[in-house]
Amino acid sequence: MKQTLKDFSNLLLVVLCDYVLGEAEHLVLGEPGHVALSNSTVTVDFHGANGTLRNVSVLLVEASSNQTLTTKYLLTNQSQGTLEFECFYFKEAGDYWFVMTREATNSSLPVPPRERSAFLKVEWPVFHVDLSRTSMAAEGTFQVGLFTSQPLCPFPGDKPDILLEVTFTNSLPEARAGQALPLEIRASKRVELAQGQWVEFDCPPVGPEAYVTVTVVLKLLGRDSVIMSTGPIDLAQKFGYKLVMEPELTCEAGVEVTVLPPPCIFVQGVIAVFKEAPRLPGERTNRLAENSLALGERRTGFNCTLFDMGRNKYCFDFGVSSQSQFSAKEKECMLIRRSIETWGLWQPWSQCSASCGDGVRERRRVCLTSSPSRPGCPGMSSETSPCSLEDCAAFQPSSPSPLQPQAPVKSNNVVTVTGISLCLFIIVATVLITLWRKLGRAPKCSTPARHNSLHGPGCRKNSDEENICELSEPRGSFSDAGDGPAGSPGDPGIPLTYRRSVPAPPDDEASGSESFQANAQKIIPPLFSYRLAQQQLKEMKKKGLTETTKVYHVSQSPLTDTAIDAAATAAAAAAASPGGSESPEEAAAGKFRIKSPFLEHPPTVGAGDRPPSRLDHPFSAASCAVSPSQTLLRKSQVRSHSRGSHFRRTASFHEARQARPFRERSLSTLTPRPTPAHGPRARTWDQAGERGRPPSRGTALFPEKRDHGPGAAGASGPLSPLPKPHSLGPPPRKPDLGDRQAGFVGAGERPEPPRARRGPSPSHRSVSRKQPSPPAPKDGYQRVSPLSPSQGRKDKCQSFPAHPEFAFYDNTSFGLTEAEQRMLDLPGYFGSNEEDETTSTLSVEKLVI
């Protein structure tokens, strides 16, 4: 209004002056003001005096810079009119002058113009600035909006650019007194001039408080003009905090509350919960719980136990908590329904469904509710889980349990299957080895026995059991006690009488090689046991022992031959030699020889007069690979026995004990029996068995055979028959047992074919029990007693056989006392059953040492 009055006063002044001076030239603005960048034009009215205006122009001049923006010319002889100035001349706000000038045309000299002018005030358009969130997901940006209600001028050329500048601070200007320098971050973007637009800006890291100042700058050529500036704007107040939650929910485990902060602000504060209820004026709310949020944390939760049962309204406040007060920045309320249906505790797991291996176990829980008819507990009331017992004693079933869920194979199942397979393999291998040992063929005795050794090199000794090696020579007969040779060149003496059965016919070769267990080792007590005890005593003294145990086996099957130690044979041969003297070398060689306990010297027999006995040739020493205990154990598995298969005799000795005197047997009724004049079964020397054996003392009896005798290397040719021996000593006397033993020295030197090492077959063995030996030749001896074996054992003393042709023992030639017969009775000695026809039958078999 004041401006209008001023303009009006100026116009009146001009009119008065013109009137006084006689001139009426002036400029009149159509609008006193204008808006820059707007699309409206500026009009100017002009009036001339006397109606004559020639060469008149109107200039638009910017007052601040005194720069003429444009010039407009009036028509000739036009005294009045209106001029329009376009909007694009007014780009900036400020003061503008319209000046009218005139030039004289009737004079050659220019007439100084009388200027007339008008003043125009131009202002900036009004822009509105707004801030908004970019989106709920994009939390690090915000938008700045720039709007104006003024229509903008359509500039024909390049439009002027707008520079939008945003300044971030962490405090207000009035709060900066006494503090450190405030944080100030600037960001700007250049945009085109528009009536309205949104410009996006990124949020710098300011902190829990942020203030924004927005400045709009017009970019002109060479200079910047600030259109507007607003701020600082508190973003927390502008946007505010928001608590994101459901309007109503059923609390099962807890209530989760999320804080949505304003743009470019980090959350830091406290969330409090309280129950919405009517309160008296001035009554404070009772907060149930408070959860603090660290810098940058936006989410927290409250347990359902804070809320009451049923449906209630609870409010959550977010603010800054101090020691004195709590300033809430945001409040949000919601309805919370807490159900009384809830699950109880899980019951213990049930037992595994399988006793071993993989199984399933189960546990249950109960829904605690006020209405059992409609339980509303969410979730499962029972659950199952697999269970596995690794210490399963039985094998796992081939098909898995139907209750077992499908699962990958575990490492413990692989270990279990591997262990079971290994156990099965061991069991099958054990059974096969046992059957092979029981039914297979036993290994042959091929290694010759060493001299002066109780066990062959291939023999195995089980504990302290006596090793007795079998010989595989056909069974033959003994020679008479007085007719047998005392020794042969290189043959050691055998201190124990034994008999051999007649060889089996050729058709029995296969049956005899099928069974090795039937041809087992047996021992003839008691004299033989005494000699073994003597030999054992020597071994104990050599080893420094005072007590040991030997195991002897007795079986009802016929006795078999075994290897005879060369030392024992040499001892018997030395006893039969005249004078009984021996050289130091012979004494050293026969250090462990077993001598006869009957110290009677045998009759001297000439070497040239004595015919060879049927057993008067050497046999190769053999060593067995099967111990006596193993052989008899196999026989005891095949045939039943009234007693145990093992009989144990314990011999305790001491070096200080005195040897008891030998008991002599009465052999008054013994009569010498002739021997066949020739040996029908002469054998060749066994070079492998006799090689390496030192010459024995029996070599001195046959000096003419020294070159051909089987010494260390043995002999390869057969023995020639020797003439029948004649007595060279005193008149014939009744030979005792020692004579008989000396006479059977050469019986152990006969080699056997390998067939008999495996023993006769069961069929052949049964035949040998009934017919132990074939009948003797016509010039031989006839059977003394026709009694059966059982009756013979009951009535007669079972002593050594009188003749190899006799099938059963005949002791009529022995005059033994009743006590001696009881002592020497083998079934009574072993405690066997006399009624058993197969128990401890002493048939025409071989005797063993």
UniProtKB/Swiss-Prot annotation:
Top-level taxon: Eukaryota
Signal peptide residue numbers: 1-24
Post-translational modification Phosphoserine, affected residues: S463
Assembly description: Part of a complex composed of THSD1, PTK2/FAK1, TLN1 and VCL. Interacts with TLN1.
Segments of this protein annotated with the region Disordered: 472-516, 595-799, 828-849
Topology relative to the membrane: Single-pass type I membrane protein
GO cellular component: cell periphery; endosome; endosome membrane; focal adhesion
Biased composition regions of type Basic residues, renumbered to the chain: 636-651
GO annotation terms (biological process): focal adhesion assembly
Cystine pairings recorded for this chain: C352-C387, C356-C392, C367-C377
Extracellular topological intervals: 25-413
Residue stretches spanning the membrane: 414-434
Major localisation: membrane
UniProt keyword annotation of Transmembrane present: yes
Biased composition (Basic and acidic residues): 652-666
Pfam families: THSD1_D2, THSD1_D3, THSD1_N, TSP_1
Stored SMART domains: TSP1 (SM00209)
Protein name, entry field: Thrombospondin type-1 domain-containing protein 1
Molecular function as annotated in GO: extracellular matrix binding
